[in-house]
Amino acid sequence: MKHFPLPFRRIGILATLCSLAFLGAFAKPLTRIASPDGNLQLTFSLTTKGEPQYALSRQDTAILLPSALGMTIIADSTVNGQTIHLSNNMRLLATDTVSCDTVWETVWGEEQFIRDQHTQLTVCLQHRTGIRMNIVFRLFNDGMAFRYSFPEQKKLRRFLIMDEHSAYTFASEPQAWSIPWRTEYYEALWQKAPISQKHDTLCTPLTLEFPDGSYGFLHEAALTDFPAQNLYCNGQTIYTYLTPLRPSSSLLTWEGDKAPSAMIDNSLPSREGRGGSSSPWRMLILTRTLPDLVASRIMLNLNEPCRIEDTSWIKPMKYIGIWWGMHLGTMTWHQSPTHGATTANMTRYMQFAAQHGFGGVLAEGWNEGWETWVNPVPKHFEYDIPYPDFDIDSITRLSYQLGVEMIGHHETGGRADEYEPQLDKAFAYAQAHNIHVVKTGYVAPIIHTVDGLQWNKSQAGVRHYRRVIETAAK
């Protein structure tokens, strides 16, 4: 991925380092930035109690009223493991504002080159315990984003994140299309209602429609070694609810009813080569029309540049496959008289795909281990042993002849802990058989990970998915 810098300039720098003397205890400093086109304005302030908050307006019309920011953490032994609320008793150390305008080249997508134009505000804060936390805002022409950053510091080497207090208090109540987080499968029916009538958890992305006919989109970007966010509503405010770790986690132990959401090692080198850690970006896209909402590039601009050096193997495609017959009851995943993933069926599907312009054919149920996969504790899946009626050599030869990819399927039944030890062997087997595309599956609300029983969207789950991606990239 290539980057092409355009003019980059700093504007109104109060200070460039966050270790300067306090600007004043619990005053009400106001810092304002505007989007590059001037239509959006963001204001950061501290209350008299040292509570960080922000507000957002568009052409002088309020969109977000002052909304809460911050986190609750349990710090390591350097501060006696105490619970610290980084949502009050904060002092402003410094701010830094920069204007950025760059163009970068995508691996693939609707556009080859994407412009990243935004104004960035970094707010450096310090809690009364001495712990420092930065909040970084980015204001685009079609929305805003922010994230929390913890500089490397002696007082904060390892810590637990207990809560994130990011909130969105809307000046005008929007309606939202949502499904609850508790479904865990993203397969519930989307319901539209005013946010004040949303009484369950919400998954992101969350699409909003405002009274003036404009639209919004709440989601996150750059999710790395962190739990995925969920949301919940109270009146006209949307709050953040991080996916918690479960008590069986081997990542850490704790006492009490409240489970932490993440364990952070703040001493590890970051991608920039320095210690420190950051949360994912929290983003709100704002557009006048739905097509503009879809066309926004904020999420892509917030994700870090691709770290995979050779991206030639990453190719999007439309595909068909053997899977829906299982849901209809006309086929089975396991071997039987109606087994779906057979040599004959794959041959028929591949010929159809070649005739009609599809790039690949997915084969669910090609490998051994499906006999008891729906049981609470599934048997061990084999990712390098096909069923006897699935001749993988003849199928992959046909795949090469027709120019249609065979898409391998690695269903885990939620047993990520059994899948991870097989990753290298499973992907080596796929590569040896000229299988360049693999679909993974986690059909379980709670997955067995190397960190114990965890929610799919937990920090442990995110770590597992990253390991799979890194193995595939090798």
Language model features: what each stretch is:
Residues M263-D265, T347, G359-G369, W373-V374:
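Intrinsically disordered, low-complexity acidic regions
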Residues H165, P205-T207, Y215, M350, ...:
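Short amphipathic alpha-helical segments and helix-helix/interface helices
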